[in-house]
Design a protein with these regions (language model features):
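Membrane-embedded, hydrophobic transmembrane alpha-helices
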Residues: 1-168, 324, 345, 349-352, ...
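Membrane-interface transmembrane helices that cradle and orient dolichyl/undecaprenyl
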Residues: 144-148, 306-323, 332
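Signature aromatic-anchored transmembrane alpha helix within multi-pass, membrane-resident enzymes
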Residues: 172, 372-376, 517-553
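Membrane-proximal, lumen/periplasm-facing interface regions of secretory-pathway glyco-
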Residues: 189, 455, 532-618, 665-666
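Transmembrane-lumen/periplasm boundary regions of multi-pass, lipid-linked membrane glycan transferases
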Residues: 189, 193, 199-215, 237, ...
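Transmembrane-helix motifs of polytopic, lipid-linked glycan transferases
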Residues: 247-268, 305, 458-465, 515
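Hydrophobic/aromatic-rich transmembrane helices and adjacent perimembrane loops
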Residues: 289-290, 341, 453, 457-458, ...
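Aromatic/acidic, Gly/Pro-rich catalytic loop(s) in extracytoplasmic/lumenal soluble domains
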Residues: 620-686
């Protein structure tokens, strides 16, 4: 007994020492990142700059030391989480009932033949889309028939709700908070509405107008038309507004919080599930992209959803779960191109579990076949399109990765760094952004890392905790999940750290932080049992602190710092209130720098599609005389061209003059406007 106590005391002290060194490491990392990031990431000066702490080496080295002590301490304790049990029992096949397997697959192949020839505005597009949906429904029906699945009775449902009412209440509270955080003041934060959001909105509007009928073709940025369908529904309900576009991300981001809860609940326990969901709900980078009307946020939903369905299917030997996992995996090809990584990772996870688990293939052969069939039924139609335009398949990856298009050699020539040095810097930027480095540009442009200091320390300790349990398949999956995204989504692409491409890592990050919080408290409880009574208070305190730190940063510091603001995007957004009322009865003329293609920004067309928009760069009386006089005219002038607009107002007086300063930086003007009726314009004579 004394030996056991001494072992636990030694382990506890090592864990405490690891935590203390980790705190010191985080302080060192934060102190080292002052000044220009370009200088900070000059890899050949890292060793030289170690002594004055202007490189990441001191902080990272201390974290390694902290990890060693923390890991040595953990070895004196046991992991109290229940083991993951996979249903590996073999169920002999019963006589097969008639299903629609061949029908479902046949419909999918027919649609692929159509997609191979059809154009984006093909009038039969909706018909084939409905047929595709029918093929998926037939597949699900076949699985239900094969497994004799039935809906649970009403009494069973109510009984289940009664048993789990406390858990459901906490989950509902987290989801409500997540939605409110993402929906509050959605049209003005982040400010402003950017061009890519306008592109997504116009893609949805094209569907609403009946111009983009073929969902098995590509739209803007080589994204399948189906990716724009949710925006079409929102625009049909709420019109051409910023709300319509951003609401899709709000819903997707909230659902991703639910999905990470489901996955963590399935493979760990409800406490870790609650914590994971809450941590993801308040993570600034996740909040930001859940409020921005681009579809990058979908990655944080598809990844945990696929993994939840796969693990649920493996634990329960549920063919229906495997079918839905295959459907969601297949749908990834129809969304943001980065979601393909979620699909690949889901398939890889299934393969990994099969290799690690004796008898798995025999027990789950039918489930795996259904999984593959479900993927095939969903993806074959779009593959039909790619077969005729194969240069678009993985086109975004080919353009963005530094491994193609002479990316690494070009950087090597420009910087004088070797390929290994370039990749090291890319990896450092992509990983340190989570705990200590800025997140410049890439649709976020935050001066702070993704995690506040205390949460960053717990995350790093969580990474060590996961390594301690790496032989457990659950921990391996979470560990690889996080780092696969960091490497493939940012390290190997241009402009690291690419915040918009690392969103799939955020659910894994939240799980790692949750594992660290519960794991450290469990170590304390094993060392001194009375601590157990304080653990709920400690967890609640940490959650409240994280919530305050993250939410106050994103909704106050980040907002008043104007880090996301851009005059060009502000121009296209704020002028909508002047341009849109013209409808088809007016024209807009932009007076500005002729070298800047402002009117190519899709936001102009999204908010006011029926208004003719032109440039007016030669401001003379003769030019005004030549203007068509059949419509009202709105002149929009950039601040540097105010004098040109004043000339117009002098030559053609009586119009409506407006000055619009930047919304959150009112000392700077954004634009001036001058509106003339067609009668006023017709009365003008040179």
């Amino acid at each position: 007994m004394l030996k056991i106590k001494n072992k636990k005391l030694q382990g506890f002290l090592l864990v405490l020492l690891g935590i203390c060194i980790a705190i010191f490491a985080q302080v060192k990392l934060l102190e080292s990142r002052h000044g220009d990031l370009t200088t900070y990431y000059e890899i050949r000066r890292w060793v030289q700059n170690t002594w004055d702490n202007t490189s990441p080496i001191p902080g990272v080295s201390l974290y390694i030391v902290a990890g060693i002590f923390f890991l040595l301490g953990l070895r004196s304790f046991v992991d109290t989480l229940p083991t993951l049990r996979i249903d590996n029992s073999y169920h002999p096949q019963t006589a097969q009932k008639f299903g629609f397997w061949a029908t479902s697959l046949g419909i999918s192949i027919i649609i692929a033949l159509y997609a191979n020839q059809a154009k984006g505005d093909d009038r039969d597009g909706y018909l084939f889309t409905i047929a595709w949906a029918v093929s998926i429904i037939l597949l699900i029906a076949s699985v239900c028939m094969m497994t004799n699945w039935r809906l649970p009775s009403r009494s069973t449902i109510f009984s289940w709700i009664k048993i789990h009412r406390a858990e459901l209440f906490v989950l509902a509270a987290i989801l409500v908070v997540a939605f409110i955080i993402r929906f509050l003041d959605i049209e003005l934060h982040p400010y402003s509405f950017i061009n890519d959001e306008g592109q997504m909105g116009s893609g949805g509007a094209c569907i609403v107008q009946g111009k983009c009928l073929n969902f098995f073709s590509l739209g803007w940025a080589d994204q399948p038309r189906l990716a724009f369908f949710p925006y079409a529904i929102s625009i049909a309900l709420f019109g051409r507004t910023a709300l319509s576009v951003r609401l899709i991300s709000v819903i997707t981001g909230t659902l991703s919080v639910f999905a990470v809860y489901l996955f963590a609940r399935e493979v760990f326990n409800k406490k870790i599930a609650w914590l994971s969901a809450f941590i993801l709900s308040i993570l600034p980078v996740h909040i930001h992209f859940s409020r921005t009307g681009v579809d990058n946020i979908i990655d944080s939903l598809t990844a945990p959803l696929i993994l939840w369905l796969i693990f649920r299917g493996m634990k329960r030997n549920s063919t229906l779960c495997f079918a839905f996992a295959g459907i969601v995996t297949g749908l990834c090809i129809y969304t943001y191109p980065g979601s393909l990584l979620a699909a690949i990772f889901g398939v890889a996870t299934l393969g990994y579990v099969a290799l690690r688990t004796p008898g798995f293939l025999r027990a789950h052969a039918r489930n795996i076949l259904v999984f593959i069939l479900a993927i095939s039924v969903v993806v074959i139609p779009l593959l039909g399109y790619y077969s005729s335009d194969n240069e678009y398949f993985l086109g975004r990856w080919k353009r963005e990765t530094i491994l193609q298009n002479n990316g690494v050699p070009a950087q090597s020539r420009a910087t004088g760094l070797s390929p290994s040095e370039i990749l090291t810097v890319q990896f450092a930027k992509s990983s340190l952004v989570f705990i200590s480095s800025d997140a410049p540009g890439n649709f976020f442009n935050s001066p702070n890392p993704y995690l506040p200091p205390v949460e960053a320390i717990i995350f790093m300790l969580g990474m060590i905790y996961v390594l301690w349990r790496i032989k457990d398949m659950r921990y391996t999956v979470v560990f690889v999940w996080f780092w696969a995204v960091v490497i493939l989504g940012s390290t190997l692409t241009g402009g690291a750290p690419t915040s918009q491409r690392m969103l799939m890592s955020t659910p894994a990050l939240s799980i790692i932080v949750a594992l660290a919080m519960t794991g450290i408290l469990d170590v304390f409880k094993q060392f001194h049992q009375p601590i157990a009574r304080f653990s709920p208070i400690i967890l609640l305190g940490l959650m409240l602190y994280f919530g305050y730190a993250n939410i106050s940063y994103y909704f106050y510091d980040y907002r008043i710092g104007h880090y996301y603001e851009d005059p060009t995007n502000e121009l296209t957004y704020e002028t909508r209130t002047y341009i849109a009322p013209l409808h088809s009865k007016g024209r807009m003329y932009l007076v500005g720098n002729p070298d800047e293609p402002y009117l190519t920004f899709e936001s102009f067309n999204y908010f006011s599609p029926d208004v003719e928009k032109l440039t007016f760069n030669t401001v003379t009386k003769e030019a005004i005389t030549r203007l068509p006089k059949d419509k009202d005219i709105l002149f929009i002038a950039l601040p540097d061209y105010k004098s040109n607009l004043e000339l117009i107002s002098q030559w053609v007086p009586g119009g409506e003059w407006n000055a619009f300063p930047r919304r959150y930086q009112p000392d700077d003007m954004l634009f001036y406007s001058y509106k003339l009726t067609k009668e006023q314009l017709a009365a003008f004579t040179h």
